[in-house]
Amino acid sequence: MPPEAPRRGDPSRVLLDHAYLLHRRDYRETSLLLELFTLRHGRIGVIAKGARRGRQGFAAVLQPFVPLLVSWSGRGELANLNHAEAAGIGVRLQHTALFCGFYLNELLMRLLPPHDPCPELFGTYRGGLETLAAGEDLETALRSFELSLLEAIGYGLQLRVEAESGEAIRPERLYSYRIDAGPVPAGDEADAVHGMTLLALRDRRFDTSQTRTEAKRLMRRIIAHHLNGRALKSRELFRSSS
């Protein structure tokens, strides 16, 4: 049965937005609580009433990493999911790539404010899943998504010039990255990274093991700062499985 068309002039009803499921959990006896990342409305929370009994007919497609078309109604923090259908074939993530996918989902839930449309980030997320599924370059997929997410929430990194002098970043120089300002020439800081790593982050190309290692360490510190010390369950799950 096709989804019910929205009533004219009713802003509380949304018809067929592209989406991905970020998280689901059981609610009461028959329903599901869902976190969705949508193309036109950003991250939203919805309730799928009766979905666990199969009354809605779309519970089977509500799986992570499956492109969806969803319709919902209602105002406030929790809307009612009226319709969901697969908009394509979901990517198949295995082993390390699966934990990377969970990591992307958790970052969206923790850092992206609700109801904040980010169509470019949506495209980056979709492309990141495809890269993870292909097993081509997990590190580049993760760093690219982290950078795009920080830009989307207003905390993009300064990766072109030194924060204090305004001079171009030098590949051979060591820098300490100040989260509230940008890169400054480093002294004996333990978290210093080479300028070539900052430029690799700017270009989203990591051609050496050094740039990969330093970029991962720097981004982990910056992400941890914006998480305010909250641990990521996806990382804990990966460690426990290793």
Swiss-Prot record:
UniProt name for this protein: DNA repair protein RecO
Domain of life: Bacteria
One GO term (biological process): DNA recombination
Summary of the function given for this chain in its UniProt record: Involved in DNA repair and RecF pathway recombination.
One of the Pfam families matching this protein, by short name: RecO_N
Claim: Zinc-finger is one of the keywords in the record: no
Classification via Gene3D superfamilies: Nucleic acid-binding proteins, Recombination protein O, C-terminal domain
GO cellular component: bacterial nucleoid
The keyword Repeat is assigned to this record: no
The family this protein is said to belong to: Belongs to the RecO family.
Lineage: Bacteria, Pseudomonadati, Pseudomonadota, Gammaproteobacteria, Methylococcales
Gene: recO
Keywords: DNA damage, DNA recombination, DNA repair
Family annotation (InterPro entries): ARFGAP/RecO, DNA_rep/recomb_RecO_N, NA-bd_OB-fold, RecO, RecO_C
